[in-house]
UniProtKB/Swiss-Prot annotation:
General remark: Carbon 2 of the heme B porphyrin ring is defined according to the Fischer nomenclature.
Example GO biological process: heme O biosynthetic process
Any one GO cellular component localisation term in the record: plasma membrane
Protein name listed in UniProt: Protoheme IX farnesyltransferase
Keywords: Cell inner membrane, Cell membrane, Heme biosynthesis, Membrane, Transferase, Transmembrane, Transmembrane helix
Native organism: Stutzerimonas stutzeri (strain A1501)
Gene3D superfamilies referenced in this protein's UniProt entry, alphabetically: UbiA prenyltransferase
Intracellular or extracellular location(s): Cell inner membrane
Similarity field: Belongs to the UbiA prenyltransferase family. Protoheme IX farnesyltransferase subfamily.
Length: 299
């Protein structure tokens, strides 16, 4: 077996290492960090902060994702969604993946310290540790509230972007964090319902496994209602204008439609469709924040 893994590990390509970083997840995080940067100032964001700040955040996020691959490699090898990942198939060794993660993390922090500020770097480090160590290494296997508690680390990018520009933590970026924090449970619990049997098989205590599907659907509805309320707050505190409010209402109504469909079992494959729409919801909501911000500047 060791020989087989060694031979397969030698076949690792740059695509395998790119996959370790979970590029699609990192891309969504970068969009929210970019929005945080642009919302932080009425002037332009310095190009060095824009380029190297986001690169630093991306490298740290990719490093945390690589650690996640290492810790979850046995789980990944069993689940249909993840069984072809590089570590699950033995194309990359755990040692190589951890070395890769370390290089990414150190490089990202060095860029943040050099081109942004110390607070942005330390908050990014805290987020990295929160996801890679606290969530992946402990919470994921310890409690059905893993997503709720660990979601704070994943919600940090808009705060990181804001702080990279201003060097300060204020109410506005914390509100952006709150939006992602409220979005995280319905996003992941919808996937957990869709993959319930697989999570049960690998003994990961996701909410549908420990408390049942109906209980999870109720909580998805509750968190979606909270998300909708929180998503209106940027308009309420004059952080955004009517264009954003309209987008928040329309996107929120569609998100609520899918969570109600999931609760009622009124649409086929409602769980995975809710999960997929939630990704577009967050992307579109933050783009609306950005567009609205520059429209406000024009008027």
């Amino acid at each position: 077996m060791a020989t087989l893994l060694s031979e397969r590990g030698a076949q690792a390509s740059w695509r395998d290492y790119l996959e370790l970083t979970k590029p699609k997840v990192v891309l969504l995080m970068l969009i929210t960090s970019l929005v945080g940067m642009f919302l932080a100032t009425r002037a332009g964001v310095p190009w060095t902060v824009l380029l190297f700040g986001n690169l630093g955040i991306a490298l740290c996020a990719g490093g945390a994702a690589a650690v996640n691959h290492v810790v979850d490699r046995q789980i990944d090898s069993v689940m249909a969604r993840t069984h072809k990942r590089p570590l699950a198939e033995g194309r990359v060794s755990p040692a190589a993946a951890l070395t890769f993660a370390f290089v990414l993390g150190v490089s990202g922090l060095a860029l943040l310290l050099t081109f942004t500020n110390a607070l942005a770097a330390w908050l990014t480090l805290a987020s990295l540790i929160g996801y890679a160590v606290i969530y992946t290494g402990f919470l994921k296997r310890a409690t059905p509230q893993n997503i709720v508690i660990g979601g704070l680390a994943g919600a940090a990018p808009p705060l990181l972007g804001w702080v990279a520009v201003t060097g300060q933590v204020t109410a506005e970026p914390l509100l952006l964090v709150l939006i992602i924090f409220a979005w995280t449970p319905p996003h992941f619990w919808a996937l957990a319902i869709h993959r319930k049997d697989e999570y049960a098989k690998v003994n990961v205590p996701m909410l549908p496994v420990t408390h049942g599907v109906h209980y999870t659907k109720v909580h998805i509805l509750l968190y979606t209602a909270m998300l909708l309320a929180v998503s209106f707050m940027p308009f309420a505190i004059h952080m955004s204008g009517p264009l954003y409010l309209a987008a928040a209402v329309l996107l929120g109504a569609r998100f609520l439609y899918w969570t109600i469909a999931l609760y009622r079992d009124s649409r086929p494959h409602a769980a995975i469709k809710t999960f997929k729409f939630s990704i577009w919801y967050l992307f579109a909501l933050f783009i609306a924040l950005l567009v609205d911000h520059y429209l406000l500047l024009d008027f």
